[in-house]
Design a protein with these regions (language model features):
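Terminal beta-strand-rich extracellular "head" domains
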Residues: 48-49, 54-55, 60, 71-157, ...
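Extended, low-complexity regulatory regions
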Residues: 66-68
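Glycine-rich, low-complexity segments
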Residues: 1-53, 190
Length: 190
């Protein structure tokens, strides 16, 4: 903190902070003291929560049930996305079971498209295990989390959802045991 000096001639009567004080004054009333802000300021925050267990027993994409929407204030804005869900994967028999969760977005009503990851096999099936036993259930439980920065280049409403998928007709449950699933959205100014 810089040293603040008050002139001795100003010690009686009122002190004029613009002419009788030198140095840096602390910000009053909890302010930051900043006179301008650089790009990257958070402009708005929205979120969506969901607490009903979703079970996917097909090899198709399935909407988990959670959604959140945000309308960017400028085409140059970015959206910082965090998402998480409790999952449980189960299989009976000798097999390799793989599954995953991905973030999908709908820009201005144009339909949902996957925006998370590059689509590689390892990224798409981020959860998995191999079961060598037959007739015995194998189960893996955990918390899937993701965060990413997305550039929608629009001022139209953007809605986000999570989709689950797996490679077989086994069970992949999300929002497992009704533990809340979240999507949090923050508009970051350019």
């Amino acid at each position: 903190m810089a040293l603040t000096v008050v002139k001795t001639s100003a010690l009686s009567g009122n002190i004029n902070l613009t002419s009788q004080v030198t140095g840096t004054l602390p910000a009053g009333n909890g302010g930051t003291g900043a006179t301008s802000f650089s790009p990257g300021k958070i402009l708005q925050v929205t979120n969506g929560d969901y607490s009903t267990q979703h079970n996917n027993s097909t090899d198709d994409l399935a909407d988990i049930g959670v959604s959140a929407a945000i309308t960017p204030s400028a085409t140059s804005s970015k959206i910082f996305i965090t998402a998480d869900t409790q999952y449980s994967m189960a299989a009976v028999g000798s097999q390799t079971f793989m599954g995953g969760v991905n973030i999908f977005a709908d820009k201005g009503g144009a339909g949902y498209n996957k925006i998370s990851g590059g689509g590689s096999f390892g990224e798409y099936y981020a959860l998995g295990f191999t079961s060598q036993a037959t007739g015995v259930e194998r189960r893996v439980n955990g918390r899937w989390t993701a965060c990413m920065l997305w550039s929608p280049s629009t001022t139209s409403a953007c809605t986000f959802k999570l989709y689950s998928h797996n490679n077989a007709t086994n069970g992949l449950s999300c929002t497992y045991d009704s533990i809340t699933t979240h999507i949090n959205l923050m508009e970051v100014g350019a």
